[in-house]
Regions:
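C-terminal helix-rich "cap/oligomerization" subdomain common to oxidoreductases
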Residues: 1, 62-65, 287-327
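A contiguous active-site-proximal alpha/beta segment in oxidoreductase catalytic domains
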Residues: 70, 93-155
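Hydrophobic residues in well-ordered beta-strands that form the structural core
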Residues: 88-89, 113-115, 237
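N-terminal Rossmann-like dinucleotide-binding module
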Residues: 1-44
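Beta-loop-alpha module in the N-terminal Rossmann-like domain of NAD(P)-dependent dehydrogenases
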Residues: 17, 46-105
Length: 327
C-alpha cells in the first residue's frame, strides 16, 4: 500500500518536493496546501487546500512542510497531534525552544520526524564522508565551506545564517563525525533588509578540527564548495555540480629548499572521481519513505536538527556580542 503524502507549501522549494514526490515509488501524492495558491502551476489535478488542517482532513499518512520557517512549529505540532509522519524543511524552527517542542511531539507520538538537510544526499558529500571514514585523509585537520550566491527574493523571514549557513553547520559535523565545541562569527546586513546577508564564522569541532564558513547573498555567482584537509591531502566537493576531487600530498622529495620550506607539504596527484549523480532531493524523499516503512534510518533526525539550531543560535549570539561561544 502506498504512503498517502501531503505537502504544505508549494512555493519556491515546495514545487520541487511536488515533482519528486510524484516520482517516488511507494508514495501517492494526494493533497497540497498553500494559502498563497499555486503560483508555479504544479498542482495538476489536485486542489490546493488552504492550510494544514485541511491537509490532515485529506487522510494523509505523511507530510512535507515547505512553508516559511515562522510557520514550521504550528504546522508540525498539528501534524504530530494527528499522527502524521513529517519531513520539515530546514531549519527545523525559528528557535531551539520551538525546535525542542516539535522534536518532543514527534518522539511522544512514535512518529518519523525528519528534517530537510538535502546536502546529506549530495553525491559528492556522500562519497567524501565515506572516504574520510575509510581513512583516506588520515587525521582531519580543517574543514572550510563557501556558500555564496545572488540575493534570493523568496527569503524574507530569516537571514543567511538560518537559511544557508545551517547547511554548512550540518554538513561539517556530519562529514567529520564530530560536534561543534565552539564558534565565533561576524555578520553584516548590506542589502537594506532586517536580517543579515553576509556571515563569516570559525570554530572548533571535537578532536580539535578547525572549521570555517563563508556565507553570503551578495555574490553574483553561485559557489557551493566544501574543503576537508587532512594529514594525507584534501578532498574538495563542488556540491552545486556534485563533483569530488582528491588532492594528495606528494611523496617525491623537493630539491628546491626555499619552495619546500614555504609549502610545508608537496603537491601530489590530483584525482577527480566519477560519481553517479542523482538529484539529492529524490534521495531525500526515498530516505523519508524508507524511515516510515521501517526499512531505513538515513534521514536527518529532529535531534540532529536541534543540535544544528543550537550552533546556529550560537553563531547569531557570537555575531551580536563579538565573542566566541562555547557549545
Amino acid at each position: 500500500m502506498s504512503i498517502r503524502l501531503g505537502i504544505l507549501g508549494i512555493g519556491s522549494m515546495g514545487r520541487h518536493h511536488v515533482r519528486n514526490a510524484r516520482a517516488t515509488a511507494g508514495v501517492d501524492l494526494v493533497a497540497l496546501a498553500d494559502p498563497g495558491g499555486d503560483r508555479f502551476g504544479v498542482a495538476g489535478d489536485l486542489p490546493v487546500l488552504g492550510g494544514v488542517e485541511e491537509l490532515i482532513e485529506a487522510g494523509i499518512d505523511a507530510a512535507i512542510i515547505a512553508a516559511p520557517t515562522a510557520h514550521h512549529e504550528a504546522a508540525a505540532l498539528a501534524l504530530a497531534e494527528a499522527g502524521v509522519h513529517t519531513l520539515v524543511e530546514k531549519p527545523l524552527a525559528t528557535s531551539v525552544e520551538a525546535g525542542r517542542r516539535i522534536r518532543d511531539a514527534f518522539a511522544a507520538g512514535g512518529l518519523v520526524g525528519a528534517v530537510g538537510y538535502v546536502e546529506r544526499c549530495n553525491p559528492a558529500l556522500i562519497d567524501m564522508r565515506r572516504r574520510i571514514a575509510q581513512g583516506q585523509l588520515g587525521e582531519i585537520e580543517q574543514i572550510a565551506t563557501r556558500r555564496q550566491s545572488p540575493f534570493p527574493a523568496r527569503i524574507s523571514d530569516v537571514g543567511v545564517v538560518k537559511d544557508l549557513a545551517t547547511h554548512d553547520v550540518d554538513l561539517a559535523a556530519w562529514v567529520a563525525g564530530a560536534p561543534y565545541e565552539s564558534i565565533y562569527a561576524r555578520t553584516s546586513a548590506r542589502s537594506g533588509r532586517v536580517h543579515e546577508d553576509m556571515m563569516v564564522a570559525s570554530g572548533v569541532l571535537a578532536g580539535g578540527i578547525l572549521v570555517n564558513h563563508l556565507v553570503n547573498w551578495l555574490t553574483p555567482y553561485k559557489d557551493r564548495t566544501t574543503i576537508v584537509t587532512g594529514e594525507r591531502g584534501a578532498l574538495v566537493a563542488d556540491t552545486a555540480m556534485g563533483d569530488l576531487t582528491f588532492y594528495e600530498n606528494g611523496h617525491a622529495p623537493l630539491q628546491w629548499d626555499a619552495i619546500a620550506a614555504f609549502r610545508g607539504v608537496s603537491e601530489g596527484q590530483v584525482v577527480r572521481y566519477a560519481l553517479t549523480k542523482r538529484e539529492p532531493l529524490a534521495l531525500e524523499h526515498e530516505r523519508f519513505r524508507d524511515a516510515i516503512l521501517g526499512v531505513g534510518a538515513e534521514h536527518v533526525t529532529m535531534d540532529e536538527a536541534l543540535d544544528n539550531l543550537r550552533v546556529v543560535e550560537a553563531i547569531l549570539s557570537s555575531a551580536a556580542s563579538g565573542r566566541s561561544v562555547d557549545l
